C-alpha cells in the first residue's frame, strides 16, 4: 500500500467494475489476443467464462486487460514470492581470506574449509589480501585463485571471476547442486548401512566378505607392510626430535 496525503492507494490492479475506461485491449484466458473491444463486451466475456477482467497494463492506450481467475492468480503470486524469499534466505555466502604468498600447510587448511562449505551447499567468497609491494604483483592473486578453483572444481564452479577490489582480489565459488545433493544421499546411505551393520553384525560381515574378490583387501585396510611402515614413522620422528 502506498500512503499519500494521509490516504492510501492500493497497488493491486483494477478488476471488473473498478475498470473505468471505454475500451480495452483484451487478452483471453490462454493468453490469446482478442483485440480492442468495448469495456462492456470484455465484462460480458468475463461473465461467460466465469472469470475476472483484470487490468494488467494500466499505462497502455487502451489499457490491457486479461480474463483470469484473480483469486487463483493472487494465491500463486503469493506462493512464488514466498518461495523466492525462502530461497534467498537460505543462500549463505561464506568467506575465506588468503595471502598471495600463503605457505602450503595454510593453503591446504584453507582449501579444506572451502571444500566443507561447498559440500554444505554454501557459496564461498575467496579474498586475496595484498600488502605493501604485493599490490604490484596482482598475478600472484590470479594464480592462487585459479589454483584453488581447479582444486575444488569437482565440488564448485567459479560464479564470479577474479577481480580487483581495492587492495584485495575476490572470487566467488558456487556449489554444484547436483553433486552436493548426491553426496548428501551417499552420506545418508552410508549411515543406513552402518545402522544395519550395528543391528546385524554377523550377517553384515558375511555379506561384506562375499563381495570382496579373492586376493583383495576390504576397503579401508592396507597391506601389513604399509601398516608397519606407518607405525614406525612416528618413532623415527620422535627420535629426531
Swiss-Prot record:
Ranges in a coiled coil: none
Keyword Manganese tagged: no
SUPFAM superfamilies referenced in this protein's UniProt entry, alphabetically: Translation initiation factor IF3, C-terminal domain, Translation initiation factor IF3, N-terminal domain
Keyword list, A-Z: Cytoplasm, Initiation factor, Protein biosynthesis
Places the protein is found: Cytoplasm
Main location, first listed in the record: cytoplasm
Biased composition (Low complexity): 230-241
Keyword check for Cytoplasm: yes
UniProt feature, compositional bias: Basic and acidic residues: 180-197
GO BP term, pick one: ribosome disassembly
Region (Disordered): 178-241
GO cellular component, one term: cytosol
An example Gene Ontology molecular-function term: translation initiation factor activity
InterPro entries from the UniProt entry: T_IF-3_C_sf, T_IF-3_N_sf, Translation_initiation_fac_3, Translation_initiation_fac_3_C, Translation_initiation_fac_3_N
Listed Acidic residues bias regions: 208-229
Complex formation: Monomer.
Function: IF-3 binds to the 30S ribosomal subunit and shifts the equilibrium between 70S ribosomes and their 50S and 30S subunits in favor of the free subunits, thus enhancing the availability of 30S subunits on which protein synthesis initiation begins.
Family named by the database record: Belongs to the IF-3 family.
PANTHER family: TRANSLATION INITIATION FACTOR IF-3, TRANSLATION INITIATION FACTOR IF-3, MITOCHONDRIAL
Name the record gives this protein: Translation initiation factor IF-3
Organism: Streptomyces avermitilis (strain ATCC 31267 / DSM 46492 / JCM 5070 / NBRC 14893 / NCIMB 12804 / NRRL 8165 / MA-4680)
